[in-house]
């Protein structure tokens, strides 16, 4: 994957001047200062005020560029100008939040699986393992949001009476569409839901039944299943994309910039003087070839702050949903998600949000968001850092996921006034502006999508 998931530690915003740098690194969460640097790169850029262009997205007509649909399942595009936090938010949402249809194979408290009910299984695979394999079968439903689980039933019964091994595949599953109370269910061609591979023309392999021996009962498998709606955040079976849902920094093809990076690499890592290297063409060619294999990726487009602003996206669908739809749906979901928090500065808080004084030596407040993770935390932190720190509306912003097994995210906001309404206003403003940004992106995507 091209981007590293956000850290679990609270990540503070950059200081506004070198004079504000702390004398020593904090040893604990409580000792975090109001404006600590996040990296050495930010230390160097700390005294440079963020340009206005970084504070709001560019016009919607220029966000998505070079959209190329290489196949029915593969899409490439460039997202610019924006920041890495927003690009990563889009990537993570496509992976975890876009809905698809699958068989749930979770083990319930009674020991059974939720959507897959195995009644006969004489294979070496345990029921749990077999249900897991069944749950990973891609089910082709083009409009998952309109899916009604009660309309279709899936079942399979295979017995191997022969002496040869028998493959049991998804194509063996029988699909029935339920009709009226007095009507017989309609048999539906299973190829509608389980597409064969275009090369082998086979469907997904579930298990293998060994050949029958004279002294033994034949191996068999029998189950029924219900297909339901879910997301990749719940289980990887519902992920609409492959591992090729990623982005990289757009390469800077400026020859002078590339030469500068090459010279720095020679001096720092190879201990070679670039001028002296001109006298040895063979050695120069070797080093240039080595540079082009990996180090050239450090030559990417940067803004005035030295941060990447252009991102090359690749989105590959597992074959059920089109990549164009996946991007559009992710933007729609992001807009709806942040809008839930756009009014926390007025009236009662949503049931999923709690506010308490910050557990630190600073004036501020901790916002605990239920059922949120790094995606929302990094999004809000990025916008507030870019837009509210310099204007002194807040003094600090950072987030963390307190525990990987608890479905919650903590966002810490520092305010000089010490008033919770000021902190709530900052978070609400971030939510509203992010919602507007993703609305603009949706409009831009609709105008260029292929």
Identify the residue ranges that each predicted region occupies.
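Protein-protein interaction/assembly regions in multi-subunit complexes
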Residues: 2-22, 29, 33-450
């Amino acid at each position: 994957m091209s981007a590293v998931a956000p850290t679990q530690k609270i990540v503070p915003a950059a200081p506004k001047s070198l004079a504000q740098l702390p004398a020593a690194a904090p040893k604990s969460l409580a000792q975090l200062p109001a404006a600590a640097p996040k990296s050495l790169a930010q230390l160097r850029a700390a005294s440079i005020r963020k340009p206005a262009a970084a504070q709001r997205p560019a016009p919607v007509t220029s966000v998505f560029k070079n959209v190329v649909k290489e196949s029915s399942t593969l899409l490439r595009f460039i997202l610019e100008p924006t920041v890495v936090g927003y690009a990563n938010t889009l990537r993570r949402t496509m992976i975890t939040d876009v809905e698809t249809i699958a068989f749930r194979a979770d083990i319930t408290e009674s020991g059974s699986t939720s959507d897959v009910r195995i009644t006969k299984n004489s294979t070496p695979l345990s029921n749990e393992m077999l249900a897991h394999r069944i749950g990973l079968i891609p089910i082709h439903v083009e409009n998952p949001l309109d899916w009604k689980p009660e309309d279709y039933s899936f079942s399979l019964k295979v017995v191997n009476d022969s002496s040869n091994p028998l493959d049991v595949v998804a194509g063996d599953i029988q699909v029935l569409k339920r009709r009226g109370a007095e009507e017989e269910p309609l048999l539906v061609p299973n190829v509608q839901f389980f597409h064969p591979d275009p090369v082998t023309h086979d469907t997904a392999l579930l298990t293998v039944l060994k050949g029958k021996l004279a002294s033994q009962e034949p191996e068999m498998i029998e189950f029924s299943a219900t297909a339901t709606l879910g997301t990749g955040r719940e289980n990887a079976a519902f992920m609409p994309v492959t591992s090729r849902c990623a982005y990289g920094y757009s390469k800077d093809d400026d020859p002078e910039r590339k030469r500068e990076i090459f010279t720095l690499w020679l001096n720092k890592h190879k201990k070679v003087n670039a001028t002296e290297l001109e006298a040895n063409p063979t050695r120069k060619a070797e080093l240039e070839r080595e540079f082009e294999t990996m180090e050239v990726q450090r030559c990417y487009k940067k803004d005035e702050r030295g941060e990447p602003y252009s991102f090359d996206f690749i989105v590959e669908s597992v074959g059920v949903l089109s990549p164009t739809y996946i991007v559009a749906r992710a933007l729609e979901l992001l807009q709806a998600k942040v809008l839930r928090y756009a009014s926390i500065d007025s009236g009662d808080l949503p049931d999923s949000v709690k506010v308490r004084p910050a557990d630190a030596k600073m004036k501020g407040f901790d916002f605990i968001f239920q059922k949120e993770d790094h995606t929302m935390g990094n999004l809000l932190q990025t916008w507030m850092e870019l837009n509210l720190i310099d204007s002194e509306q807040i003094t600090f912003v950072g987030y963390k996921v307190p525990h990987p097994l608890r479905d919650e995210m903590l966002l810490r906001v520092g305010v000089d006034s010490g008033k919770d309404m000021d902190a709530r206003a900052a978070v609400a403003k971030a939510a509203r502006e992010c919602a507007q940004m993703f609305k603009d992106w949706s409009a831009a995507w609709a105008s260029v999508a292929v």
